[in-house]
Amino acid sequence: MAKEYSRTSRVSQQVQKELARILQQEVKDPRIGMVTISGVDVTRDLAYAKVFVTFLTVGDQTNDESLEGLNAAAGYIRRLLGKAMRLRIVPEVRFCFDSTLTEGLRISELVSGAVKADKTKLAASGRTEEDED
């Protein structure tokens, strides 16, 4: 049975904090822009870290370009991470786009549209929401 708060989860949280600081203060690649780290998954042996990111895109910049910039700077970011954290093995960083935010917004819009359509149908039929209950 695994511990409820294992070492890998603690390392994941610390990696997330340090990467957020590094991306904000150290990395100056214009392709990257505004990045939000939504989560970090570290393997049990701490060799790899999959970093889930979302972007606040500005202008013509796309998520693919920003992700390409992050993955190009992964070695430099790993070196800075090694300086910031006291680990015997610094995880190899891999950046992945996190689509949960956009999917959540899409689902929220679908639900809002369905509720609005139901209200217009009720109003058109002359009934109220209390009559339905």
Curated annotation (Swiss-Prot):
Presence of keyword Cytoplasm: yes
Q: Which residues form a coiled coil?
A: none
- GO CC terms for this protein? cytosol
Gene from which this protein is expressed: rbfA
Q: Which organism is it from?
A: Psychromonas ingrahamii (strain DSM 17664 / CCUG 51855 / 37)
One GO BP: maturation of SSU-rRNA
Q: How does it assemble?
A: Monomer. Binds 30S ribosomal subunits, but not 50S ribosomal subunits or 70S ribosomes.
Q: What does this protein do?
A: One of several proteins that assist in the late maturation steps of the functional core of the 30S ribosomal subunit. Associates with free 30S ribosomal subunits (but not with 30S subunits that are part of 70S ribosomes or polysomes). Required for efficient processing of 16S rRNA. May interact with the 5'-terminal helix region of 16S rRNA.
Identify its protein family.
Answer: Belongs to the RbfA family.
PROSITE patterns associated with the record: RBFA
For molecular function, the Gene Ontology terms on record are: ribosomal small subunit binding
Q: What is this protein called?
A: Ribosome-binding factor A
Keyword Cytoplasm (UniProt): yes
NCBIfam families xrefs: rbfA
